[in-house]
């Protein structure tokens, strides 16, 4: 009797799905945090958790096994030099999926997937970025009106 495998197909062929998950995994290892759809984030979490667990072994065989999934030498280097050192003795749960608001164009469920040990608090410039921009826009509007009134 046919049994259903517990993986999401993501509406793709097997080769396309493998390539998509490989690319998402590579980007997650390089950038530590990516925004994607919720289904892709959850599938990427399954792949990345297994990759990091293999990497913790640190053997040549583990490197070769990981290189099957991630064909990027920079991502492999980051994985073995930075991420494995950072996760230390953590027994799993290396990633976190945070749900976001739906995407504007098609209302797809969006999520952020990030590595747990790479939380960075937003800097002061990031926190006030929108406020500064609003002030500049308001200020530029006033200066534009003043220039029109002087010219007119």
Swiss-Prot record:
Alphabetized GO MF terms: structural constituent of ribosome
A Pfam family assignment: Ribosomal_L17
Keyword presence, Ion transport: no
Tagged with keyword Methyltransferase: no
Highest taxon of source: Bacteria
Gene Ontology biological process terms from the UniProt entry: translation
Family: Belongs to the bacterial ribosomal protein bL17 family.
Name the record gives this protein: Large ribosomal subunit protein bL17
């Amino acid at each position: 009797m046919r049994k259903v495998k517990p993986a999401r197909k993501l509406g793709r062929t097997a080769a396309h799905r493998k390539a998509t998950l490989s690319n998402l995994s590579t980007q997650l290892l390089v950038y530590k945090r990516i925004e994607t759809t919720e289904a892709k984030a959850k599938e990427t979490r399954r792949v990345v958790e297994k990759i990091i667990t293999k990497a913790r072994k640190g053997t040549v065989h583990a490197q070769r096994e990981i290189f099957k999934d991630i064909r990027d030498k920079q991502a492999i280097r980051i994985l073995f030099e930075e991420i494995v050192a950072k996760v230390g003795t953590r027994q799993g749960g290396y990633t976190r999926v945070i749900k976001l608001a739906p995407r504007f164009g098609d209302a797809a469920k969006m999520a952020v997937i990030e590595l747990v040990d790479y939380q960075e608090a937003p800097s002061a410039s990031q926190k006030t970025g929108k406020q500064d921009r609003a002030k500049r826009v308001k200020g530029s509007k006033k200066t534009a009106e003043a220039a029109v009134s002087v010219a007119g």
